[in-house]
Amino acid sequence: MAEAAALEGSEPVDLTKHPSGIIPTLQNIVSTVNLDCKLDLKAIALQARNAEYNPKRFAAVIMRIREPKTTALIFASGKMVCTGAKSEQQSKLAARKYARIIQKLGFPAKFKDFKIQNIVASCDVKFPIRLEGLAYSHGAFSSYEPELFPGLIYRMRQPKIVLLIFVSGKIVLTGAKVREETYSAFENIYPVLTEFRKVQQ
């Protein structure tokens, strides 16, 4: 997993934290913040060039910035959701930028209760997996209906993370509030994945 190491700043993988030698890559961070003031969404949409507002479709202004590349949903209550950042710091930086845009439009926006709500990460174990066998022996945690969705959905209890496991060995992890939960969920599942490794004929 040289790519993961390169992304994390090119130091070698710390095997005490990541015994599998694989570090899941963060793909999307969802965060929320309270701007703590009522907002006139129509006025915001008219004044901000990176904003769209279609109240018949959705009761929020959708705003986008390029750096960090993110999308915000801004509600009249002053609540805001920020999605698309690739790290916690980037998510907070983006949320601050949106808050600043709202301030510049003349609203007394604050920055209260910033919170990471969901971290989505992915990785590749680089070997195929027997999903039927895994689903059968871990029935309490797994749902696998290949006609509906090609991946096995594994609901881990501790940490409370949902994993999508694909035959190819690609894994998506979602539901974490801190990245360590993502890492420990992956380390928990890794021995199970190796147990159900498909033997190539």
Curated annotation (Swiss-Prot):
Major localization class: nucleus
Residue stretches of each Sequence repeat: 26-102, 116-193
Alphabetical UniProt keywords: DNA-binding, Nucleus, Repeat, Transcription
Pfam families the UniProt entry points to: TBP
Molecular function in Gene Ontology: DNA binding; RNA polymerase II general transcription initiation factor activity
Subunit structure: Belongs to the TFIID complex together with the TBP-associated factors (TAFs). Binds DNA as monomer.
Name of this chain's protein: TATA-box-binding protein 2
Species: Triticum aestivum
